[in-house]
């Protein structure tokens, strides 16, 4: 998952709760480091990351950037209840930054919202994981019933066919992301599933991004093994599935509550290699970390 260059992990570790968790990449990577992914703890230096500033006194995360939250956990994990109020406060302070929340636990969300939530904060992009049809039918109706101004779906790991046409017609879903499974015991992703899901998004004018094929990819009846994420991303891009739907507009404001002019917002920058990345359509831009391609 490399579609945004900034990640904020206020806590680490998770409890598996559905089929998509079976081969969790976080558990795999922790095991490679001789750690236990089931051990849940609040991060120390990383917890306040969105508030950290550079030597010039400017925020490290610029106005208009988009940050993925809890990519090694779940923001609505029950074990994280003692820390969530503080995390909400950080997002409240950075009303100029978009926070991308993704959960497999939408049933817990309403009880976890801050008291001043109202109809939702405009800088929160709330997404639910729909790894198969069962979870789509379970989680999307809950998503629709929650007070968020921006909503999306992520079919990853994409382990079975998913149809969301009936949900897209409601007009609440602004973006759909899908990607195959990686690392430990990856289950196959079938290109037919991707094409079908993409067509539903095109018909509804909803942005669709196929970020990676996964390790095991089935196309035209042939089974392919793609051993690294860079290759998977390039193949996803090459498939031509990515589609830019209707624009998503976040009304970001400064510390005083005033709208931030468009010219003052962060503009993603990309390198040549980014042009063949499956995630470019929804990416926060290249951070020049040197880790990809």
What are these regions (language model features)?
Residues 92-95, 147, 195, 202:
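Anion (oxyanion) recognition and catalysis
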Residues 128-132, 144-175, 180:
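Histidine/lysine/aspartate-rich catalytic loop segments that bind and position anionic ligands
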Residues 99, 124-126, 151, 208:
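Hydrophobic/aromatic residues located in beta-strands of well-ordered beta-sheets
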Residues 21, 69, 101, 143, ...:
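Conserved, mostly hydrophobic/aromatic
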């Amino acid at each position: 998952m490399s579609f945004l260059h900034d990640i904020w992990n206020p806590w680490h570790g998770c409890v598996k709760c559905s089929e998509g968790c079976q081969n969790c990449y976080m558990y795999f990577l922790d095991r490679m480091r001789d750690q236990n992914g089931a051990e849940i703890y609040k991060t120390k230096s990383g917890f306040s990351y969105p508030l950290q500033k550079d030597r010039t006194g400017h925020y490290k995360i610029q106005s208009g950037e988009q940050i993925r939250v809890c990519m090694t956990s779940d923001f609505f994990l029950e074990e994280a209840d003692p820390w969530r109020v503080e995390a909400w406060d950080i997002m409240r302070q950075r009303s100029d930054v978009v926070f991308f929340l993704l959960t497999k636990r939408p049933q817990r969300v309403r009880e976890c919202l801050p008291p001043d939530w109202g109809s939702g904060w405009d800088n929160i992009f709330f997404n639910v994981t729909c790894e198969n049809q069962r979870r789509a039918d379970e989680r999307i109706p809950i998503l629709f019933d929650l007070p968020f101004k921006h909503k999306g779906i992520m079919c990853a790991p994409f382990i079975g066919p998913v149809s969301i046409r009936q949900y897209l017609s409601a007009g609440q879903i602004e973006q759909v992301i899908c990607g195959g499974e990686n690392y430990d015991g990856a289950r196959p992703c079938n290109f037919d599933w991707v094409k079908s899901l993409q067509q539903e998004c095109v018909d509804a004018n909803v942005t669709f991004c196929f970020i990676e094929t996964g390790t095991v990819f089935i196309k035209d009846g042939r089974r392919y093994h793609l051993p690294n994420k860079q290759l998977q991303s390039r193949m996803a891009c090459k498939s031509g599935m990515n589609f830019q739907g209707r624009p998503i507009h976040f009304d970001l404001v400064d510390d005083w509550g005033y709208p931030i002019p468009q010219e003052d917002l962060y503009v993603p920058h990309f390198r040549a290699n980014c042009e063949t990345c499956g995630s470019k359509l929804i990416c926060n831009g290249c951070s020049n970390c040197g880790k990809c391609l």
